[in-house]
């Protein structure tokens, strides 16, 4: 292996480098967020990345917080991710700023970073002032709540704290104060609501000011979490220069905004919006409502925002009064529509579809109703408190072509920096299909199964896609928010639901419940954020107490249905001919899932220095793995369980197969795949991530590559052959066409073909071992880390690697630091 190091800056004079350090810090984060205005703690953590033109190790750092709150002084440490604040005690509502500089191994120091803002939100025992208010209850109406006030002078700083049960949107003096949509993020609304803080300083003026908050029920409905009031509620507080100035109370007025939501927000019940253009509210005093038992805490993930505005690829006049709009691909979006001048009261029905243009089913993708105002220039309609999954839009009762129509694609506003491309266009197409799907499903602070039919944060779907999404994007804050909903939805006896938030009962099994453990551990591996483990470890252990209740003779058995959870699934959504209802298969899958939980909890306990529990979890894992082999292995056939792909690969992944039997079980897996399944994938939601992880760890890239390349049903290429533009819910194209069932394959592109395997939390240490399927000429992969992007480009037997400062990579037994490395790598 010959090695060449490439430095893009070229040769730099030693004298110049001594005077001007060629490294700097960038991408500063507080609690994983960029300049957050309201974190949920008085002890923040700071992170930064370092760009360097030369080989570098951070030897020391210095952090300042507002100069006098904390001056760390020079701290000799390589730590640059989640560095804890150690200064004077911070207070609720306190706004501060921080900066950092670093030294390298040659004792050169960088320039100070620019000052970065952060704020402590409203944290206990402090509480948000004001009362919950609402207006125009019933019939799904979205109220507009307003209050005028006069200022003699403008403040230096104005912060508006808003806590809504349901969604809200704020405007001040005619301007929206944020680009966020569907605010706040989701939470377990019968236990926790979220506070969002806005800096509204620039929107204020001397004299009369008008503050309006529009609100929509969203998930706050009698049919979901139950409600105190038949409509959304808002509590808000405006602070000027650190002092309370205005709160929501009986002095506010409310009226109907012209928006109404008629859906139940149960399965198939998301409906859409009825929008009356140019509606003038009939102002009346608001209702002041008392809300009990719902904790209000700061939102700790990025908001949901519009990422792009998509134009249609065609607008077709399909009848005298109907238009069919095709956006070319399925998308999770809000619809923007500008209609021509129409008579006042004219009704334009709008239908959405994710697949067939001639079968737009409102039961799946919903429908809107737009009622025109009669203004000569025509009306503009835009979804406000709902959204749709669609490729096709049909407009009825419209003779003229719409003036403008766009899809406002939205998601949680996380950085998305992962990328993949290779010499095989089939693989590129599969990757792009998965990438597009998970990006569209990660919105509002969680990841849903589908955004059209159920819109639930299923744990099974979450487990299936966690590694995929975390390889593709920096979603640490999203997982913090989502895992908080899981902990909040835990029952007093330790039982967990299958979805979180948990508005009503939904189907699944133990693999779904295990999301609390698996997602927390995998997030720690991806982002080195120990808070996740510290915060949710008690809930994980409590869930195991519940599991013990249903453990018989060393094996987990079926537990009962409850009002918050139903079914006891093994795999789900497998191809036709694979019996996921086989009782032995269900028990095998669920006990293998429990093995994964014990392995993860052992590692979590070690990180938290709970060594006694770590030993206990290891012992329980070993006992369960032995029982799985004893009970589910059939010596005569050499099979486990039903002999399905999942029943063979899951025991292999969790180490339940004795080492002496592994070759024969692998041979049976491959042989049965070839003969029984014609070389196709033959598994479902649980099986795809399990098979992917096993193939990655076992370096079975040729075999998995062959499965992916197999045309016809079932498979990803089949979806593409049939015109799919998102991953389907079922292999045959049933139900949703933008779904989270089969996205677990995404991690294979990064960890197998790119060969980027973490060996320390936060990817601080990695092993780079690209796997090379026969016939795949080249691969280029970029995987972002808390330290910066890692890029791997393999072309034939040569390898180029880009490693950020702070990361060390092991490649064929040699250790490499930051820089651009060009290797002749003999596979």
Indicate residue ranges for each PLM-predicted region.
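C-terminal motif of bacterial Sec signal peptides marking the signal peptidase cleavage site
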Residues: 17-18
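Non-catalytic C-terminal accessory modules of carbohydrate-active enzymes
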Residues: 230-237, 251-277, 290, 297-309, ...
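Alpha-helical support elements that line or immediately flank enzyme active sites
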Residues: 158-162, 172, 333-352, 460-489, ...
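Bacterial N-terminal signal peptides that target proteins for export
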Residues: 1-8
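Active-site acid/base region of carbohydrate-active enzymes
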Residues: 167, 233, 247-255, 402-433, ...
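C-terminal capping/lid segments that line or modulate ligand- or cofactor-binding pockets
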Residues: 211, 264-276, 453-454, 472, ...
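Extracellular/oxidizing-compartment recognition motifs
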Residues: 23-451, 477-478, 497-501, 531
